[in-house]
């Protein structure tokens, strides 16, 4: 039985008893931000669970209650932030209070009890790990010497294979192609091995990525209702999590063992495992390395493929933008044959297309949850100040912020020109109307790797091919419906047909 349904069967009788005997005490002083009324014991659990789209539901709450909304999932208080001003308050002004992470069951287990950099609570260990990632793994020098050749080789390889598909007049599943590209780049960068389109290795790798996602978004009763934690065992979720962890740990260990072999052929460039093994010590154990690999795999593959799929969706739905982007790229590159990273400064419209894609279709519609470490006072103005308790989970809705008409003119339209008018807006978490990768202490450490891959791939896709919908389908038939989850996936797969562009 699904853990959610099993929990609900048991929870409602308890909620009824709770309602009979519970009398809310009067609280003196500042109150929590407003929000929809919940039920005793379960809070707003039933409302969130029945919502077909969590990010759409949170957006609707911001329209009704404002930029700060209070929810409760069982014993866990939740704060939803939906404006640039309040995002700045959380991500910058009071960052130290809001910079921890909730210790969610799935994330904690797969990150070796919080040894990673993305999901770990704010601890001394996290600070050491973050410093190592910033100063050793994702430096600008390493991006140029180690990452760039891999990116350019894998994008060229994808373009060559797509050219064969175009010659055969076949349709392609865009996300599958982009996912394969991202997987090949990340696997080569991380451990010097490509997991290709076919074969047992690729199947195993993709299966593990799928299980990681399932465990991250899966419902563990113990996260919200600790007294019912035993349901996780009864429902099978705990056993599934243990199996997933065991499989991942074995996979990581195999990779590390391969790198430790004395007769291993030396690669001309270091991969991330090489770098980590050279820095192994008290604050960087093998478990820490495995936890970092989790972040690289999970964050690097899905985000790149998702953004590329949404970029192509938006361009196909907006043919004028598509044509303008292609004209820019082809006029700059000419008959050189491909776009490389040195060409980026001459392609401002292309880069604006990527930014606009992540505004309208943010890779994470709700940023990875934060958790307050102490009480906080927050509000839009002095007449609307609220108290936020310690251990409150904080959701920052990029879906709502990117669609805010107070910030963006015609927010539902795909208009890359808005970023040409605001060249100061970047990915560094400095303008809080646009923070697709977060900001402050928790900003994504691998921004440059991900964004550069998207820009390089998209530029070459638009340079080399014209794009059409499948036979019998019109451009206006391409939808932008979304699924529910941590990442903003397309509900319906995007099938498109490449047609090789021939210069006159």
From Swiss-Prot:
Heme binds at residue 444. CDD domains: CYP71-like. It comes from the Eukaryota. Its main location: membrane. One of its GO terms (biological process) is coumarin biosynthetic process. It is an enzyme of class 1 (oxidoreductase). Its EC number is 1.14.14.-. SUPFAM superfamilies: Cytochrome P450. It is a single-pass membrane protein. The record marks 118, 299, 303 as: Substrate specificity. One of its GO terms (molecular function) is monooxygenase activity. The chain crosses the membrane at residues 1-21. Pathway: Secondary metabolite biosynthesis. The keyword Cell cycle does not apply. Involved in the biosynthesis of coumarins and furanocoumarins (FCs), natural products required for defense responses against attacks by predators with potential medical and agroindustrial usages such as anticoagulant, rodenticide and artificial vanilla substitutes. Able to catalyze the hydroxylation of esculetin to produce 6,7,8-trihydroxycoumarin. Belongs to the cytochrome P450 family. PANTHER family: CYTOCHROME P450 83B1-LIKE, CYTOCHROME P450 FAMILY 71 PROTEIN. This is 6,7,8-trihydroxycoumarin synthase. It comes from Pastinaca sativa (Wild parsnip). The gene is CYP71AZ3.
